[in-house]
Structures are given as C-alpha cells and as structure tokens.
Amino acid sequence: MMTTDIQDGLQELDSLLSHADWQLADEVTFQIMLAVSDRRDAGWLDQSAIANFPCATLHQLDQRWLFYSSGRFGFSTQLHIYREAAERSSFEFSRQAGWVMNLWQPIGFFNFYHWLNFSLDAPQGHLPALWFWEMPWYRSWLIGGFGTGRGGGFGDPSLFDALMLRLERCQSI
C-alpha cells in the first residue's frame, strides 16, 4: 500500500471515529489492514499476514481507536483483556468482549458480525472486530459457521492469538 493511501485511510478513520461511526470505522480499519498486508484480493487476514503486520500501522490504528473511544476500544484494550482472560481460558476474551452468544454454558458460538454492538455501550475491547470476523466461506464452515464469517461458529483463537502476539512484539519496539 502506498504511503498516501495509508494516510488517506487514516484520515478517513479519524473522521469516522470522531463522529462515533464505530461500524464504518471498523470497516475502514479492516480495509487499511488488508491493504497494508497486501491481502485486498484475498479479502481476509491469515496468521502470516498478522505476524508480519507493520508495527507502525498497528500503533497508528490502535492510538486512534484508544483516543476516540477514551480507551474503551482498540487493540491495546483487547490485549489487556486478553492477558487477564488467558489465565482462565483462551475463549474468555471473546465472552468478555461480547463477541460470543451464550446459548449453552460453557459452550458459546460467535455472534454474527452485524449483531455486534457498534456503540460506546458495547463491552470494553469490543472493537475493532471485522479483521477477526472476515474469512472465506470454507473456513467458516470448518469452524461450524454458516459460510458468512465467524457467525455461529465455534472458537478458533489462532488468528486472535496471532494479533495479540504481534501487538506484544510491536510494543517492545
């Protein structure tokens, strides 16, 4: 992705976040992530793309989400919750962030993306989320989804774990 494209995307993100348009901001965040990772054609992020995600862009995205949500949303907020939740179970973050529908305890299925709460009333760490939801239909089927992303599927923490590891490594830079 060209530097000017990144800057344009970040300016658009600033505008959306400043107007509390959380869902569109989430979509723009995902588009920036795809472009920076050279995954626009694929339309989703895999573990390799996350592992090689540029730290500078990750920090820029995170700082914007943190600033405009007063620390409620952002990758750093997710990392903080993830660290605490990991002591109990790998799926606990998803429950705390409101990403899971609790139909039967202790089993939970991921919400459909359009069921997420795109307001400041959402649980802490709820957004950004689209980067985690988007996946090809066949991967969705493999985790029990309906071919539309994570919705209705079981937990597959590998992608989220990859981003949390990348964020930890980027924080030390």
Question: Language-model features: where?
Answer:
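Surface-exposed peri-terminal alpha-helical interaction modules
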Residues: M2-I173
